[in-house]
């Protein structure tokens, strides 16, 4: 009996994710309700609440499912090269229509504590942890110095992308990414020791 219930549950789960993304992309986070997501998915509101505690978490999970591994750190010859490639992937994502969805969610999160928490927990913190691990690997490889604050370095690298995404202050193009990466290296790359 449990085996027949599981596929139905998975189908409902997937339908809810698709409905949430479709509605939010079309109308914006604030304009969509849990009831509308459930109705669009063809499920009851309680079915939605069995999977997620609130609208913010279902919307974030729908976004994450859409993205998949699109902005994950790629395999490369070194941690630094993986970091450089991932910056380019993140920039391409922000330039896409999905970047507009991130911009909208960050904007809405300023006045919605549940969305702000879901955005941090499901989007921002896992990505920061991936960058942190990558930078630590580059330090272990001897490519980067180990005497800097990694969280500040993450903000320097990725904060500029979010700044341009949110404020439209400039293009998030390949040249901008290379400049950002090179400036990061200029301040953090390991140097040969100098004789005294």
What is the predicted function of each stretch?
Residues 71-100:
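Hydrophobic alpha-helical connector segments
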Residues 1-2, 85, 89-92, 129, ...:
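C-terminal peripheral helix-coil segments that are non-catalytic and often amphipathic
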Residues 92, 96-100, 104, 114-141:
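Amphipathic alpha-helical packing segments from all-alpha helical-bundle domains
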Residues 118-123, 140-155, 174:
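All-alpha amphipathic helical-bundle segments outside canonical DNA-binding/catalytic cores
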Residues 49-52:
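A short His-aromatic
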Residues 54, 108-113:
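Short loop-to-helix capping motifs
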């Amino acid at each position: 009996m449990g085996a027949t219930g599981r596929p139905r549950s998975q189908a409902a789960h997937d339908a809810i994710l698709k409905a949430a993304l479709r509605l939010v992309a079309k109308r914006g986070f604030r304009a969509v309700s849990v009831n509308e997501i459930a109705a669009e998915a063809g499920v009851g509101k309680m079915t939605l609440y069995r999977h997620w505690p609130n609208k913010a978490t279902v919307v974030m999970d729908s976004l994450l499912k859409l993205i998949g591994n699109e902005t994950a750190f790629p395999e490369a010859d070194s941690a630094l090269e993986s970091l450089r490639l991932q910056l380019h992937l993140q920039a391409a994502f922000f330039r896409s229509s999905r970047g507009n969805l991130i911009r909208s969610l960050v904007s809405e999160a300023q006045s919605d504590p549940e969305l702000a928490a879901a955005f941090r927990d499901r989007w921002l913190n896992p990505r920061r942890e991936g960058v942190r691990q990558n930078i630590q690997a580059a330090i272990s490889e001897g490519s980067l110095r180990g005497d800097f604050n990694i969280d500040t370095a993450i903000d320097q690298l990725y904060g500029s992308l979010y700044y341009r995404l949110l404020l439209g202050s400039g293009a998030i193009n390949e040249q901008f990414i290379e400049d950002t990466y090179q400036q990061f290296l200029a301040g953090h790359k390991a140097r040969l020791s100098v004789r005294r």
